[in-house]
A protein has these predicted regions:
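Single conserved hydrophobic/aromatic residue that forms the stacking wall/gate
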Residues: 1-8, 12
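C-terminal amphipathic alpha-helical interaction region
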Residues: 17, 30-179
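Short, charge/polar-rich alpha-helical segments
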Residues: 23-27
């Protein structure tokens, strides 16, 4: 397959580029925390555009293959982490912070699932929730209250406010209508 692609390498790289780009767009929409994959993709494309000799083309193709493989693995990460959906993993990624204990990580996983469930249930009750200040405030308060009640004590006031904002922005972009 690689050798066949190398003969028509320009076309093959363009095809692979298009597939990776589409996959990245879906993944970033589902989980904005995956931006590092997009950054890696841009590095590969920039290197390819800088110099197009045969060695660069071969390296670019191999880099794109490797990136595509890691994207496939990332798309299955929610299963490895014990979640039932990529959405739950997205909330977890937004709440995750370095230096958490194993127990705190388990708590964050539970909070992620619980918070997403509560948000979806609340949004389902609200008519065009993103259109009115009152309904936006209901969702924002739900996020704030859940984080205050359920996050580990290692999260301070500043952390909770930061995570509240991140989760709200994610929900606002991801669930403009009934979830």
């Amino acid at each position: 397959e690689i050798s066949a692609c190398l003969v028509g390498s320009e076309m093959c790289i363009r095809d692979r580029d298009e597939l990776v780009n589409q996959q990245l767009a879906k993944m970033l929409f589902a989980n904005p925390q995956r931006i590092d994959y997009y950054d890696r993709y841009q590095e590969i494309i920039d290197a390819y555009n800088a110099e197009q000799n045969r060695a660069t083309i071969e390296k670019t193709f191999m880099d794109l293959m490797e990136l595509a493989s890691s994207l496939d693995m990332e798309q299955q990460r929610y299963v490895r982490e014990g979640f039932s959906s990529d959405e739950e993993l997205s909330v977890y990624d937004l709440l995750f912070s370095e230096n958490l204990t194993k127990q705190e990580i388990e708590t964050i996983k539970k909070v992620s699932v619980d918070l997403l469930t509560k948000i979806k249930q609340q949004i389902a009750k609200l008519d065009h929730w993103t259109d009115k200040q009152e309904t936006k405030a209901i969702v924002d308060n739900l996020i704030r209250n859940t984080l205050w009640q359920e996050l580990p004590n290692s999260y301070d006031v500043s952390d909770i406010q930061t995570y509240q904002k991140k989760i709200y922005e994610y929900v606002y972009m991801r669930y403009p209508e009934v979830a």
